[in-house]
């Protein structure tokens, strides 16, 4: 049995030495020291030996097992160190390589249009005013000369939350709130923000869109002041060569009311698909603040006057950037948005 032990030990040590990986080394351990390994079998067979042989053979078998175990652990440490070194070498980083540029985004076209309009009016002495998107019926309609039952309310199908609360259909309530708070003082504001209407979404309509309204109130404010303001806006957004025209219209909160058109920037008036062969493009609605609106806010229409206008940000962006479907602005499609990187100022 001693010869058998020496032979097993030599075989085990040789295979340990030949093992090139931790996996191979573990296979050697299982083969010789596992539950079914020969060294384990020898230990199990100790009971068959005589009382005189058992102590001597027990010591020999334990010595062989301890020696093989020690060599296994030593070899495992060497292989683990080699594996770590190999992994570090494969994952090394060349710090002299140039860094990879991070892909950065850019401003959304609607944001850019709104900021451009805000910058223009701030430069003209206007302030930016904001108000709640969930609004009272009074400020959304009644304070703007739209009492309950007024037929013009049907023009703006609304999202009502309760009988007296709704999602605002325009940013005009901000104007009504500002007039009420100013208590007869002069006003020069623009009111950008989201508005909501019960429209069916299509290429030119959305149930939610961005609107920018303007309001000026003071002494001797005339229609000529409104025209000059709108002319400045048109030239800023669509080019210095643009001309404007004002057409009579109707809005309950202004009197007189007008629609503003600009000369077509694509065909120069010759007629094209953008202007529908008219040479003019409709841009926005405006007018002089109705005396009833002034009175409800605490102003004396005999002493002060004012003008107001409303701009659809999507409308301006669609014309400015040649977008044919309003829904593109809301899809977060990078294929659409990335093209505006080239036009970033």
Curated annotation (Swiss-Prot):
Entry binding sites for Mg(2+): 255
GO CC field:
cytoplasm
Against SUPFAM superfamilies, the record matches this protein to: Class II aaRS and biotin synthetases, tRNA-binding arm
Q: Where in the cell is it found?
A: Cytoplasm
**Secreted recorded as keyword:** no
Reactions accelerated catalytically: tRNA(Phe) + L-phenylalanine + ATP = L-phenylalanyl-tRNA(Phe) + AMP + diphosphate + H(+)
Please share the entry's free-text remark on the cofactor.
Binds 2 magnesium ions per tetramer.
Q: Note the CDD domains from the entry.
A: PheRS_alpha_core
The prosthetic group or cofactor this protein requires is: Mg(2+)
An example of a Gene Ontology BP annotation on this entry? phenylalanyl-tRNA aminoacylation
Offer an example of a GO molecular function term for this protein: transferase activity
Enumerate the UniProt keywords alphabetically. Answer: Aminoacyl-tRNA synthetase, ATP-binding, Cytoplasm, Ligase, Magnesium, Metal-binding, Nucleotide-binding, Protein biosynthesis
Q: What is its main location?
A: cytoplasm
| EC number, UniProt record | 6.1.1.20
Origin, by domain of life?
Bacteria
The UniProt family comment states:
Belongs to the class-II aminoacyl-tRNA synthetase family. Phe-tRNA synthetase alpha subunit type 1 subfamily.
Q: How does it assemble?
A: Tetramer of two alpha and two beta subunits.
NCBIfam families noted in UniProt = pheS (TIGR00468)
- Annotated protein name in UniProt: Phenylalanine--tRNA ligase alpha subunit
């Amino acid at each position: 049995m001693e010869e058998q032990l020496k032979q097993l030990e030599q075989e085990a040590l040789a295979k340990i030495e030949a093992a090139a990986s931790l996996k191979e080394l573990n296979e050697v351990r299982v083969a010789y020291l596992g539950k079914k390994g020969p060294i384990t079998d020898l230990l199990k067979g100790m009971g068959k030996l005589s009382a005189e042989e058992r102590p001597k053979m027990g010591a020999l078998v334990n010595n062989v097992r301890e020696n093989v175990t020690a060599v296994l652990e030593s070899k495992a440490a060497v292989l683990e160190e080699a594996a770590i070194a190999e992994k570090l070498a494969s994952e090394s980083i060349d710090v002299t390589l140039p860094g990879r540029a991070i892909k950065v985004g850019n401003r959304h076209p609607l944001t850019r249009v709104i900021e451009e309009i805000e910058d223009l009016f701030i430069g003209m002495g206007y302030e930016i005013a904001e108000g709640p998107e969930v609004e009272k019926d009074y400020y959304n309609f009644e304070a703007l000369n739209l009492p309950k039952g007024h037929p013009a309310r049907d023009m703006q199908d609304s999202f009502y939350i309760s009988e007296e609360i709704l999602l605002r259909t325009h940013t005009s309530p901000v104007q009504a709130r500002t007039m009420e708070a100013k208590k007869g003082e002069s006003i020069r504001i623009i009111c950008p923000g989201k508005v909501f209407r019960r429209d069916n979404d299509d290429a030119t309509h959305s149930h939610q869109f961005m609107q920018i309204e303007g309001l000026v109130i003071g002494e001797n404010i005339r229609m000529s002041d409104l025209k000059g303001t709108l002319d400045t806006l048109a030239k800023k957004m669509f080019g210095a060569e643009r001309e404007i025209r004002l057409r009579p219209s109707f809005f309950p909160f202004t009197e007189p009311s007008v629609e503003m058109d600009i000369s077509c920037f694509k065909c120069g008036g010759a007629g094209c698909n953008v202007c529908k062969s008219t040479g003019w493009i409709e841009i926005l609605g405006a007018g002089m603040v109705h005396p009833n609106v002034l009175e409800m806010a605490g102003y004396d229409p005999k002493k002060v006057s004012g003008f107001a206008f409303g701009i659809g940000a999507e409308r301006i962006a669609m014309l400015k950037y040649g977008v044919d479907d309003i829904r593109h602005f809301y899809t977060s499609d990078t294929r659409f948005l990335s093209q505006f990187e080239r036009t970033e100022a």
